[in-house]
């Protein structure tokens, strides 16, 4: 069942974010000082603790907002997504909360722990292909043949608005002297949503995106002036290993993001270590990217 994604103007996002229906399932996460890292750098570093969400990731926000915005007939038919990780779990939990069917197409190479996590949340797992692109193509076929609604991991204004509730929370939580927010970039939904709200509420704050050097799809898109498809992406930070960013997320980043930096694998590992030293939490590489 194909419900067209309604285009959104940039200045419409703040209101869409403020109306986002995420807190039935997500929680407002704390903004905590990284005491050890701050002392070492001689600068105050704050961390937004999205690892404390029910599925340990911000992805739940966008997935739930999308489902909560669908009409009853679409919910009755069910939803589908393609993902090898956090988006899959976010859609599965969101669907369980809304009591709707969720089909999750995952590559056959997906680690069993992630497959089991989706199944434990009630998702119907379909294993297909060796890579995300294969799973995505299969999901779009099943969307058409079974009358399901596809929940895109990033290139949908409702998903972007759900992720943008992090920006809404940051606007309330950040001290007045915060000068910059660093945001990991995969497909661009997280930074697009955060930038759309913070440039409205705290325009003086710089929004800086962070990508792995070997998966810098947004940097490539901005250099080309349009989304491009990378020939290859690294797999270390698999949560942000996207070959092509979204059309809408590209548009938002092009107009709202101040700067994008790229980091090597060694730097990502150092970020993971820094987070552990301050929180005793072990984050995945994509989670350590911003640090």
Protein language model features and the residues they cover:
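PLP-dependent amino-acid enzyme catalytic core
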Residues: 1-291
């Amino acid at each position: 069942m194909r419900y067209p994604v309604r285009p959104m103007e940039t200045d419409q996002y703040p209101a869409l974010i403020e109306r986002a229906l995420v807190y039935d399932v997500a929680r407002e996460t704390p903004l905590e000082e990284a005491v050890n890292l701050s002392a070492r750098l001689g600068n105050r570093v704050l961390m937004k603790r999205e690892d404390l969400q029910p599925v340990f990731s911000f992805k739940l926000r966008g997935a739930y907002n999308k489902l909560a915005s669908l009409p009853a007939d679409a919910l009755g038919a069910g939803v589908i997504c393609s993902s090898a990780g956090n988006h899959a779990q976010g859609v599965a939990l969101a669907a369980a909360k809304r009591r709707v069917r969720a089909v999750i197409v995952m590559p056959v190479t997906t680690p069993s722990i992630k497959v089991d996590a989706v199944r434990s949340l009630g998702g119907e797992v379909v294993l297909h292909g060796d890579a995300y692109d294969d799973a995505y193509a299969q999901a779009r076929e099943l969307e058409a043949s079974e009358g399901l609604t596809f929940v895109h991991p990033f290139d949908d204004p409702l998903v972007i608005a759900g992720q943008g509730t992090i920006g809404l929370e940051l606007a309330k939580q950040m001290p007045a002297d915060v000068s910059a927010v660093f945001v990991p970039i995969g497909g661009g939904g997280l930074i697009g949503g955060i930038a759309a709200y913070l440039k409205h509420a705290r325009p003086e704050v710089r929004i800086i995106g962070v990508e792995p050097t070997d998966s810098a799809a947004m940097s490539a898109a901005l250099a080309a002036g349009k989304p491009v498809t990378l020939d290859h992406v690294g797999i270390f930070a698999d949560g942000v290993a996207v070959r092509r960013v979204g059309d809408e997320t590209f548009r938002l980043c092009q107009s709202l993001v101040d700067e994008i930096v790229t980091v090597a694998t060694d730097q990502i590992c150092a970020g993971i270590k820094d987070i552990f030293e301050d929180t005793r939490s072990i984050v995945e590489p994509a989670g350590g990217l911003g640090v």
